Amino acid sequence: MRPDIADLRKSYEQGELDEAHSAADPLQQFEQWLDQALKAKLPEPNAMTLATVGADGRPSTRVVLIKGCDARGIVWYTNYESRKGRELAAHPFAALQFHWVDLERVVRIEGRVEKVSDTESDAYYRSRPLDSRLGAWASPQSQVIASRAVLVANAAKVGAQFLLNPPRPPHWGGFRLRPDRWEFWQGRKSRLHDRLRYTQQPTGGWLRERLAP
């Protein structure tokens, strides 16, 4: 390890998170923080790390983009035959994490994952730029390929086949994580950070608790 890595430190002093000023509903708290991240013009505030676990118990992570958020859960779109798609098919639970560095904030979300409806996937697919729609056909995501030329050739082939109106591939669509646990982290001075955890109760409400940093 480079000797200077261990010496990198930062004092977190931009904000605070307390029970009196946080929402009782975690979705409302998340939407408030997401709105602030958007207004701050952070780079890709919609980016989130998705963690899944394979049938062999090996975890994996990757960055995906949130495409929807409501009382039903958090939505993103992907290739169902990718590694994450196959892992979610075998073990339909996942964790998401947003890290808004400039705001010194992290949000973690856990829950069960399901596919969104075909209607939802079709609507979002149609909203994408043409190149992105063709790319969903051209890329055999997570498979080994000989070179980038394979992707370029595939894109040209599907472009000639579908022209300006490619249908949604049957292997491509959305997932929705239905949260049963949220955690909000706000960096604080002296490493005495604020952490609030929301756990869904059998009644449908949420238990809010403070965790030690």
From Swiss-Prot:
GO MF terms held by the record: FMN binding; pyridoxamine phosphate oxidase activity
Binding positions (FMN): R62, V63, V64, L65, I66, K67, Y77, T78, R83, K84, Q141, S142, W185, R195
SUPFAM superfamilies for the chain: FMN-binding split barrel (SSF50475)
Cofactor binding note: Binds 1 FMN per subunit.
Cofactor (UniProt): FMN
Record-listed E.C. numbers: 1.4.3.5
Reaction it catalyzes: pyridoxamine 5'-phosphate + O2 + H2O = pyridoxal 5'-phosphate + H2O2 + NH4(+); pyridoxine 5'-phosphate + O2 = pyridoxal 5'-phosphate + H2O2
GO biological process: pyridoxine biosynthetic process
Function, in words: Catalyzes the oxidation of either pyridoxine 5'-phosphate (PNP) or pyridoxamine 5'-phosphate (PMP) into pyridoxal 5'-phosphate (PLP).
Matching PANTHER family: PYRIDOXINE-5'-PHOSPHATE OXIDASE, PYRIDOXINE-5-PHOSPHATE OXIDASE
Family note: Belongs to the pyridoxamine 5'-phosphate oxidase family.
The name this protein goes by in its record: Pyridoxine/pyridoxamine 5'-phosphate oxidase
Organism: Methylibium petroleiphilum (strain ATCC BAA-1232 / LMG 22953 / PM1)
